[in-house]
Amino acid sequence: MEKLIAHLKSQGFIFQGSEIYGGLANSWDYGPLGVEVKNKLKQAWWNHFVRKNPYNIGLDSSIILNSSVWKASGHIDGFNDPLIDCKKCNSRWRADKLIEEFNSEINAGVMTENQMEEFIREQNIKCPKCQACDFTQIRKFALMFKTNQGVLEDESSSVYLRPETAQGIFINFKNAQRSLRKKLPFGIGQIGKSFRNEITPGNFIFRTREFEQMELEFFFNPSDEKDWFSYWLNEVETFLQDKIQINKENYRVRSHEKDELAHYSTATSDIEFKFPFGWGELWGVAHRGNFDLNAHQEASKQDLTYLDPTTNQKVLPHVIEPSVGVERMMLAILWQAYHEEDLGEGNSRIVMKLPYNLAPYQIAVMPLQKQQNDQAQALYSNLLNNFDVTYDETGNVGKRYRRQDAIGTPFVITVDFDTPETNSVTVRERDSMEQVRINLDELEAYLKAKF
């Protein structure tokens, strides 16, 4: 992992947040190349789950919502972690994580606070920092970032940074349905920032306090006999394998046991990825029932039911939610792509084998020598009309190839001494390093076929 982090920083993918001021813990900035991968990932998700799906539409809801939303959803009262302090070194930990790291077979999420305290005491679980076995009682730690809106700083002006994008979709269910005259079943997709004041964030960008989510809430009539849960789980796997080329051996699907289910869920399956630190949740697909719409209907006193045009009966739709974090998906993609290769005879290379559609640049154009600059520049300008292209003229050809390998550029086009006479260029593919000669009249068609 450390090698990957160092590589991503040196190549302009991800930087430490606020680095010139000593950094800010758990804060990361996406550099010139990282933001390209991130935006292409989000675009791929949007195309697959919203734009190209016959059922779904999009939304962009506010980050700051009326606090009543979070009261109704249960976040204000129930969105917290069990916090415990070491009396010796004053470090703070999540009690449930201490237990689960001590014994991975235990699901501490179903234990009461008293049960967790007793287990920690009986098993003599040690503080990871100082190795002492002396902890405070567990107390609840609210995970939502709280602030004030306007000039007053009292409870009447209290607002929260959203901990998830889902609630913005639920409270806009009727607006979206009415305005576009949508009939069940249909879904609403959203990409946006969320914030959670995690006690123990970590593992690079896997768990951060500021993160981005790609969520879909799919509404359907509870009498609908189609297995929508399996449908969306299959769509998630299709996206992973076909759209962003996550290797099947690198992920697994795990269904939650009854005692693991969230209070709103009747069924949940996690897609877990084999990260460098072990298996971790990548994507969740949850059957939320009508929990959220019912909660907001009761709290707001607004009718959120759907009038079925066939039966003329009002129904409160049920919901399937596929939800994934952008940063976690980024980490999975970048980790899978990173390769150190021995080329023999003392030569090696670092290559980012990114999916072609997610690479920061699709193509690099470079002149073999300065004499070819004008023709190479003209080709570069022409290709910019249809591709994401970079121009590289610094250093010898071998170094430039390695530089493009290191950032994941799929194809490098070299304009050389023969180009003016033959009207052709050399095209090198990243993963195989194979080179072919392509006529300039056929170059664009050749490249389009690759993407």
UniProtKB/Swiss-Prot annotation:
Molecular function in Gene Ontology: ATP binding; glycine-tRNA ligase activity; protein dimerization activity
Top-level class of the enzyme under EC nomenclature: ligase
Q: What is its EC number?
A: 6.1.1.14
Cellular location(s): Cytoplasm
Q: Which UniProt keywords apply?
A: Aminoacyl-tRNA synthetase, ATP-binding, Cytoplasm, Ligase, Nucleotide-binding, Protein biosynthesis
One Pfam family from the UniProt entry?
A: HGTP_anticodon
Q: Name one GO cellular component term.
A: cytoplasm
Q: Which residues bind substrate?
A: R94, E164, F211, E212, Q213, M214, E215, E321, P322, S323, V324, G325
List of residues binding ATP: 196-198, 206-211, 281-282, 325-328
Which reaction is this enzyme known to catalyze?
tRNA(Gly) + glycine + ATP = glycyl-tRNA(Gly) + AMP + diphosphate
The record, for InterPro entries, names: aa-tRNA-synt_IIb, aa-tRNA-synth_II, aa-tRNA-synth_II/BPL/LPL, Anticodon-bd, Anticodon-bd_dom_sf, Gly-tRNA_synthase/POLG2, Gly_tRNA_ligase_bac, GlyRS-like_core
- Any one of the GO BP annotations: glycyl-tRNA aminoacylation
Family matches, as NCBIfam families: glyS_dimeric (TIGR00389), PRK04173.1 (NF003211)
- Subunit details for this protein? Homodimer.
What job does the chain carry out? Catalyzes the attachment of glycine to tRNA(Gly).
Spell out the PANTHER family in the cross-references.
Answer: DNA POLYMERASE SUBUNIT GAMMA-2, MITOCHONDRIAL, GLYCYL-TRNA SYNTHETASE/DNA POLYMERASE SUBUNIT GAMMA-2
Name the protein family.
Belongs to the class-II aminoacyl-tRNA synthetase family.
Name this polypeptide is given: Glycine--tRNA ligase
Species this protein is from: Mesoplasma florum (strain ATCC 33453 / NBRC 100688 / NCTC 11704 / L1)
> What gene, per UniProt, encodes this protein?
glyQS
